[in-house]
């Protein structure tokens, strides 16, 4: 119940709503189904609220499971104090749990491990206790592994460095100070790898971590990955050292070395990794949310129903690919013309005549021009032709993903006899007629909805974009007699196999006119119905 209360407080929903959503999900109901058909039970929660409840439940469950594991492991070691147990139980992030667990994790053999095994722990304690004449005291701890006083003191320092670097309170202090006061920086590493100088503004860049914007984080990550940039940090090291020294009474000089090593060799690198991870997670979440919103708007563009459309896939050298589709999206014909340079004048003139012939023969009402290579030149060509053809207009269509679709198994199945370029022209025409029906055939990541879509977690991006597609399809609805398997598969309760069976049933039995007929589709049981 504590988990439910956290979800309720965070999301502003009731305990009953949370219980209903999670119960329905456990029973196999999908988010679109719950949002559309269980409004009474959920109190009219929409898809976004339902998904937020499910996601937060997963996150809190993972956190609780990890706490349970960590507590059990520390208890096995006999080192679980009431204070430590409470700290772990109160931790709100996985990263905080890992910080508390760090001193108790099984480690590979370190210099500190070897020093402890050689019995140097008491000498380390003497450093902390400001032992007078430490060098003479160290003579009592010499061994084969640490044969000199210098070696023994160095070993004792290693023990303290590891202990301080793993102290949860000091690590939290360091983390908070870095979050507030440190800068993230970047400098030029190899200009030859940035021919177009895409990353020029990051050649000499610095920004407070607290003010870092998501798109800058993703840009630094990409520049670093490509070998163009070197990313680093500037820390208030002196300020941190003063904080640390205030925690220790020892003034023998060795403690300064301990603190310096603990910070520079252990804590700062660890905190930098943590903060880079956190900045990236925040940036990814923001980018994915933006990509999802862009995709949603794209899918919800109003369809242009009942019009004969000519799809125009522009190109320079290889010629423009044309495809005419009827009012239902059925392909009528395809053609290749050479309307722009480097085509010769005679080829361009022939292209004009061919375009006019197609418009007249198939009663084309609107031309959809792809916005890719040679789009401007093609637009000028089409505009010139349409001066001689009344009542026909053109529109520029976002062709992102059309080439991906044209080379896909689905496109090969739809148009096995056509080249990929002609399939692409058909896709451009159809996405003007019905953007949703056509775009669902394409992997959402290929539709071109965001600048950094290849720099974020592909798993999280796919899940988010797939959720948007499912939500929009179920919001808009589909025509069971015309929808493709790709579109049907996003309907709540249906999958790829059932969707293909629906289309096959249509082809064999004709138009579906009643709900009773739907139940006759193979594999479409009462639960899916």
Protein language model annotation of sequence segments:
Residues 1-19, 26:
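Generic start-of-chain signal for non-secretory N-termini
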Residues 3, 36, 62-79, 89, ...:
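Long, highly charged, low-complexity intrinsically disordered interaction regions
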Residues 29-47:
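Feature marking long nucleic-acid-engaging regions of large polymerase/nuclease enzymes
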Residues 24, 37, 73, 163, ...:
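Generic, well-ordered alpha-helical scaffold segments in large soluble proteins
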Residues 308-325, 351, 355, 484, ...:
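Extended, hydrophobic alpha-helical segments in both membrane/secreted and soluble proteins
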Residues 26-28, 116, 233-235, 314-316, ...:
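Flexible glycine-/small-residue-rich
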Residues 49-52, 59, 63-311, 315-417, ...:
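Duplex nucleic acid-engaging cores and interfaces of nucleic-acid transaction enzymes
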